[in-house]
């Protein structure tokens, strides 16, 4: 980047941050699809969830939260503390 044009630098940083947000959103959608595939293997949820399915969903959501927190922390470090 050309340090002589701070407005261009700011724009490029914002563009990079938005691209990273989009990638993160895509990853969340991918993980959601995977959780669905794992917890509802037959692609249709039962009329009433059993304990096994509830545990599966809970574990999957917890892993998604862990992944989300990791990604936010990683992006924050990459952006010098600004997400």
UniProtKB/Swiss-Prot annotation:
Disulfide bridges in this chain: 35-60, 39-56
Keyword Membrane: yes
Disruption phenotype: Worms display mitochondria with an interconnected morphology, presumably due to defects in the assembly of outer membrane fission/fusion components.
Location in the cell: Mitochondrion inner membrane
InterPro entries, per database record: Tim10-like, Tim10-like_dom_sf
UniProt membrane topology term: Peripheral membrane protein
UniProt keyword terms in alphabetical order: Chaperone, Disulfide bond, Membrane, Metal-binding, Mitochondrion, Mitochondrion inner membrane, Protein transport, Translocation, Transport, Zinc
Function text: Mitochondrial intermembrane chaperone that participates in the import and insertion of some multi-pass transmembrane proteins into the mitochondrial inner membrane. Also required for the transfer of beta-barrel precursors from the TOM complex to the sorting and assembly machinery (SAM complex) of the outer membrane. Acts as a chaperone-like protein that protects the hydrophobic precursors from aggregation and guide them through the mitochondrial intermembrane space.
Subunit structure: Heterohexamer; composed of 3 copies of ddp-1/tim-8 and 3 copies of tin-13/tim-13, named soluble 70 kDa complex. Associates with the TIM22 complex, whose core is composed of tim-22.
Family: Belongs to the small Tim family.
Name used for this protein in its record: Mitochondrial import inner membrane translocase subunit Tim8
Organism (species): Caenorhabditis elegans
Species classification: Eukaryota, Metazoa, Ecdysozoa, Nematoda, Chromadorea
């Amino acid at each position: 980047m050309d340090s002589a044009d701070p407005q261009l630098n700011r724009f490029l940083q914002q563009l990079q941050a938005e691209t990273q947000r989009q990638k993160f959103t895509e990853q969340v959608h991918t993980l959601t699809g995977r959780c669905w595939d794992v917890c509802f293997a037959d692609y249709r949820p039962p009329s009433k969830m059993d304990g096994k399915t509830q545990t599966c969903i809970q574990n999957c959501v917890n892993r998604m939260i862990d992944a989300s927190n990791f990604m936010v922390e990683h992006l924050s470090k990459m952006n010098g503390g600004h997400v």
